[in-house]
Structure formats: C-alpha cells, structure tokens
Design a protein with these regions (language model features):
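Glycine-enriched alpha-helix->loop->beta-strand junction motifs that scaffold or abut catalytic
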Residues: 1-3, 22-27, 46-53, 108, ...
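Short glycine-enriched loops at secondary-structure junctions
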Residues: 8-11, 36, 96
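Flexible, acidic glycine-rich loops studded with aromatic residues
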Residues: 196-218
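Active-site loop/helix belt of alpha/beta enzymes
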Residues: 55, 61-193
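N-terminal active-site wall of soluble small-molecule enzyme domains
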Residues: 1-22
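Internal, well-ordered alpha/beta segment that forms a basic, Gly-enriched binding/recognition surface
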Residues: 26, 30-52, 60-64
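Acidic (Asp/Glu)-rich catalytic clusters
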Residues: 18-25, 42-54, 79-89
C-alpha cells in the first residue's frame, strides 16, 4: 500500500505513527517545506529509530499560498538539509497549482505553467546534486481539477536519473463545484482532452432556509 499525505507532518505523535508504519510494510510519503519541519522530524525519529528513513517530498508553493517553498534557492537549502538527515529520504517533489487563479474566479494556464516549470527546475537541480534517495522510482506530484492535463503533459516530460512516477491529485473529497469547473476543467464545457469527455453534474444538494434576516440574504 502507498499513501501520499499532502501536508507536512510535524506533530510528534503523528511522526511516531509514520515511523511505525514503515515496519509494517506500509509505504507512506509526506511533505516537507522548511528547515524547522526537518528539525522536528529528526528529533522525533531519533527517539523512535525507524527501520528505514521516512520518505518525504519537497513541496513547492506560490506567493500567498498556504504552504510550500517560494523560491528555487529556498528549496535547494531545504533539500540539502533533508539529504543530510539520517532519518529522512528525499524521494520526490510536489506542489498544488489548484489555487492559482486569474481573471476573477476562472483559472488561466500561464501562471500554472510557470509554477510547473518551477517544480521541474527544482527537481532537475536536486537530481543534479544527487540529493534524491536511491529508490525504485522518483515521485513528482501536483494536483488540481482545472489543469491536470497541463500537469501530466509538463511533468511527464521530466528526465531524471531515477524512473519517474507522476501522480496527479485531482478531485475533492466528495464532489466538485460544478459551476466553476464546468468552465475550467479539461473535461468541462470546452474539452481539452481530444475527446468529447465531459464531466456531468451528478449530485444535487437540497437545504432548508433557516432565516432571511434582510432582503436578498438567506
């Protein structure tokens, strides 16, 4: 079994759980985006002594975003620190382009492409420095529901020393917002897949109005 936790794990108890999962044949990856996060993981793992280093993915982010490294230089500093850790194994890179928006609520491709290029550049630089852990394959992952076709196209052309596995993380927990994705998705009103593959609204939610405190507000 393989699971990607698309977040940093910095709570000691949760890090201990991850360490124990390694001894049970369970392959789990989490993100790393700071020296502070590395220090927390090192401190906990030094006490737990996992059977092998915990695999982590270096996370890139965008200005104003929730997480992730903002620049190539910052990313390489963190990658070098992971490579020095006896308890962590740098096994790939990651990012999330889904929150990149322009022209109101409708995402556009250009800033997404620039962000993907940044992930590619960081991956190449880490690979050139030999900081990726020798493993059966290198994982590069991004995810969003509007431009996953761009993600696959750009990341799958990466050339690395290790075999490459591209993972897309598109899809919400239960359902999507049909309104915005009907316009933006490569399987929306204007398909970009080369086929007439269109997403169809499959869930309708009913609710009860509890209050109308003022005109036009419910």
């Amino acid at each position: 079994d393989r699971v990607i936790i698309a977040n940093q794990v910095v709570v000691p108890g949760e890090i201990e759980w991850l360490a124990k999962s390694l001894s049970e044949g369970f392959e789990v990856f989490c993100y790393i985006d700071s020296i502070a996060g590395i220090e927390i993981m090192n401190e906990t793992l030094a006490r737990v002594r996992p059977v092998r280093p915990l695999p982590v993915l270096l996370e890139m982010g965008i200005a104003g975003g929730r997480t992730g490294l903002r620049t190539i230089d910052e990313a390489l500093l963190v990658a070098a620190e992971v490579a020095r850790s006896p308890y962590l194994a740098l096994t790939g890179t990651s990012g999330f382009e889904g929150i990149i928006q322009a022209h109101g609520d409708r995402p556009v491709a250009e800033p997404v492409e620039k962000f993907l290029d940044q992930i590619v550049e960081v991956t190449h630089a880490i690979d050139a420095n030999g900081w990726f852990e020798p493993s059966p394959e290198l994982i590069v992952t991004a995810g969003g529901s509007a431009f996953f076709d761009h993600v696959v196209d750009r990341l799958s052309r990466l050339e690395t020393a290790l075999p490459l596995r591209v993972v897309i993380r598109s899809g919400c927990y239960i359902t999507h917002d049909d309104g915005s994705l009907h316009q933006a998705s490569p399987m929306g009103e204007t398909p970009r897949t080369g086929h007439d593959d269109r997403l169809v609204a499959a869930i309708e939610i009913w609710g009860v109005v509890l209050s109308r405190p003022e005109p036009g507000r419910a």
